[in-house]
């Protein structure tokens, strides 16, 4: 009795919250709280056993990422359940619904993608495999996507709440840099279960970029990306070659090219952008405002403005890629009869604001409306002209047809660029004062244009008689490089998601 009374303080009636640390083996076996006293805990003293603590025991609980993968798998099964009743026996013939056994191609199962994201993150520097999944079903006999439910190939294991979050993430973090979607118009048809293939592709492209820029949904990006590419390719192979092209298909290719560039899949980004350029030409978006066309009805103003934005974004990407790689430009400015896009605020609110033509905007020293994206387009045009002049001069030199006015052309471009830099400083706020991704990129683009003009001159320096002129351009190029470094340091003060995502396409090497 005395010994029991003596040991009672070590076992209080009201136990406190278990201390941090490991319990002994006896307490674990009996599922009791261990007080952790040394050399023996209270339970071991009462039991008369040796108190042993195993310091090599693995931590309790499920493995990292297991619960997330389990939730995604449950959500996927919930989504597929109604789809099986809608699709019926056709689902087994869908080439995109067949699960792939190769881990490298397994992008349709989000549950597998989520489990991989916790242990082995996807590579960010290697080129992805763009081949279509192997199938024994011919393209002509495969069912149309229009007959399927909203689950494309079983790769949409997300609830309506997650869809809404991904859509909002896109317009919060992606749209400020790539302003090619009308938010109300997109959300209007995105909620409908029945969508045509091009809109499904665009929706998945939106989710691909949104998940890339999300900490919560990053494990879904590979699945969304693979499904978008496969659906785009399959719709091209199975569709009618004479069928009209939808704007949503071009928008999807532009977003996918941007995603691939951000993931450093540069060759794939170039190929995807090329598809967008050819579709832009096929839709003749370069002549939306041609005087030979009838006036646009008021009900179609938003749709027409969206087409303008798609064209100019494709034009902008074309020039950025050509500038970086010294490639010929695909979308030539001299055949464009499409007005520049209206400011995004007016576009989203549906106000009919008519932009200027490119040739007018380049020479306008007192712009009536301000748009950072339009400034980027104008600066890209100046660089494109410099690139074209340098390429043309090199070809003429080979054929012995030297143009005597190269210096005059370069001087004219330099004067136009100087005016645009002054407009940026006078009519727009400083990029350090306002967090606008397109405005920051416009300022960086302006300084990069100075460097690009110098590179164009350096490529044909043998054609320039005045050596002092070359030295002056070199000094200005060095000053522009220092200004870019200064602007880039200022971007570190902003949120990562507020940085312009087209900056992943470098203007210069």
From Swiss-Prot:
Matches recorded under InterPro entries: TF_fung, Transcription_factor_dom_fun, Zn2-C6_fun-type_DNA-bd_sf, Zn2Cys6_DnaBD
GO cellular component annotations of the record: nucleus
Keywords: DNA-binding, Metal-binding, Nucleus, Transcription, Transcription regulation, Zinc
Residues annotated to bind DNA: 24-51
GO biological process: DNA-templated transcription
Biased composition (Polar residues): 132-143
Protein localization: Nucleus
SUPFAM superfamilies: Zn2/Cys6 DNA-binding domain
Induction cue: Expression is stimulated under green light conditions.
Record-given protein name: Citrinin biosynthesis transcriptional activator mrl3
Biased composition (Low complexity): 109-119
One Gene Ontology MF term: DNA binding
Chain intervals for the UniProt region annotation (Disordered): 1-22, 97-143
Recorded superkingdom: Eukaryota
Function per UniProt: Transcription factor that regulates the expression of the gene cluster that mediates the biosynthesis of the mycotoxin citrinin, a hepato-nephrotoxic compound to humans due to inhibition of respiration complex III.
